[in-house]
């Protein structure tokens, strides 16, 4: 018999898992639950990436305001799935559903749990300069990402990997792993492990203000922010009340007696700004309401004063 699955998810990260579960001949996707359509502009509403894919695949999809509503519970109770798979859905599932489907609700989480429970694990693995990242499949319980872990897959990180690349790697790894777990569920369930609360950390949502460069920080910290916050919110600095977005940087570790934030040199190779333990070289930037430019292009029609403090 096929595994009957209800899939809950919303953003791009969840689409690969949905697709792979759908493609697996051992599975039957009974229903997809996603977040409500979001208003974009001029009263136009856009579906989530998961809803869009579900519709393309011809799968029934609902977008309840609250997944814990009575009518959703009744529908789930009637469908009686073997598994409810949760991938970046965006709402917490409460006790009634958890009790009804005990040990049947599986979550794909983009970190090596118990590290980085919460909303932004991929960002924080780069912000903190981690040397490895990964995905975990866990049982969903009432706590935030606190359930027993059924499986983990890890990846080594170099200093060059950026947010979008890591996102896509973990997206594929998560899709692979959830398929393996469901295909051989009893084996993974029997070897499940409790999370060590002493090693747990929780990360919140990413906010736009986090992208502002603080030149009092060390070069590695600034570079890791560039890796972990690009493309959104992206790095930026303020100049005469203008927000200047930064699209590429290099770093130089070198003792200097310049003030942090001082623009030391400006030429076609970049804007050289002093920081706590060296220099940040800004090689591509974007003025408000303009397209991104390499510094050599920028200097063709603009100037940037040396000696100012950013």
Swiss-Prot record:
Q: Which gene encodes it?
A: fmt
Give the originating organism: Finegoldia magna (strain ATCC 29328 / DSM 20472 / WAL 2508)
Does the keyword field hold Transferase? yes
Q: Does the keyword Manganese apply?
A: no
Q: Which UniProt keywords apply?
A: Protein biosynthesis, Transferase
**Full protein name:** Methionyl-tRNA formyltransferase
Q: Which HAMAP family match?
A: Formyl_trans
Top-level class of the enzyme under EC nomenclature: transferase
Reaction it catalyzes: L-methionyl-tRNA(fMet) + (6R)-10-formyltetrahydrofolate = N-formyl-L-methionyl-tRNA(fMet) + (6S)-5,6,7,8-tetrahydrofolate + H(+)
What the record says about family reads: Belongs to the Fmt family.
Annotated EC: 2.1.2.9
């Amino acid at each position: 018999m096929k595994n009957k699955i209800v899939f809950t998810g919303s953003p791009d990260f969840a689409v690969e898992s949905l697709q792979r579960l759908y493609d697996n001949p051992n599975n039957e996707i009974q229903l997809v639950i996603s977040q409500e359509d979001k208003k974009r502009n001029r009263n136009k509403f856009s579906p989530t990436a998961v809803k869009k894919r579900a519709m393309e695949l011809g799968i029934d999809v609902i977008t309840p305001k609250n997944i814990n509503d009575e009518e959703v519970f009744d529908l789930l109770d009637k469908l009686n799935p073997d598994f409810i798979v949760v991938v970046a859905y965006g709402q917490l599932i409460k006790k009634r559903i958890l009790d009804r489907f005990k040990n049947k609700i599986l979550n794909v989480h983009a970190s090596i749990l118990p590290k980085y429970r919460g909303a932004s694990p991929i960002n924080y693995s780069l912000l903190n300069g981690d040397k490895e990242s990964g995905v975990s499949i866990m049982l969903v319980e009432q706590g935030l990402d606190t359930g027993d872990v059924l499986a983990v897959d890890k990846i080594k990180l170099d200093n060059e990997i950026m947010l979008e690349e890591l996102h896509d790697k973990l997206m594929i790894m998560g899709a692979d792993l959830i398929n393996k777990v469901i295909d051989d569920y009893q084996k993974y369930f029997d070897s499940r492990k409790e999370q060590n609360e002493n090693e747990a950390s929780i990360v919140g949502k990413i906010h736009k203000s986090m992208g502002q460069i603080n030149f009092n920080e060390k070069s590695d910290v600034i570079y890791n922010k560039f890796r972990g916050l690009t493309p959104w919110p992206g790095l930026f600095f303020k100049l005469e009340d203008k927000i200047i977005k930064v699209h590429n940087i290099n770093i130089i570790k070198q003792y200097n007696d310049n003030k942090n934030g001082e623009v030391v040199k400006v030429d076609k190779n970049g804007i050289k700004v002093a920081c706590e333990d060296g220099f940040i070289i800004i090689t591509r930037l974007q003025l408000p309401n303009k397209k991104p430019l390499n510094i050599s292009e920028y200097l063709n029609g603009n100037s940037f004063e040396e000696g100012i403090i950013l």
